[in-house]
């Protein structure tokens, strides 16, 4: 009888101990779990950083756009130059390229930085991914409320004053629009490229994704819609322009880029 009394608890404790020792992937979060980054291998290999939108309502974290060097009209270009501009009481949790740019690394779409409009909303037709309509804008107000809005819808909101962006970056195409994959994406598409994008998701988090292998637009959009549960998601860029800084998972791309989006944390 003594054996029957003590065997189950001991085995349960052993199983719990073994379970606790098992690796949980490459997920690493800060102490408050406001953000985390990890590397995933399904449905394809990708790196993702999650940000709890509620964290932006406090004073410890801020989502920002960066473009030019301080007191200069020269673009920052790299994560290293951005890091050098941050004050000693702040650190860059993670960052990625924020959208498409011209030959001078200036944004080609609507851009607002700290309430100042850098580039007006671009509703013109054209070629390339940016003009694969509908495209959209990731934007947030001074209160840290983040949205991804289709460009024509945002145009109407700007006219009425409903939208008052403190930061904004326009890119395209939209990946997911109101829970629907972009209508021009082909499930059998054969154009495979490295891609990065961002989604505002139903669990209250933002998902910043950088594919670590070439994928189609449809595959990339499906990740946001089906796995990450993002009703709205926006393509930022791809190929050689796709860049990620996430030191918690040993990611630090050295590429040149235009506008950068990043999460800044105040040091305790």
State what each model feature region is.
Residues 1-4:
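Positively charged n-region of N-terminal signal peptides that target proteins for export
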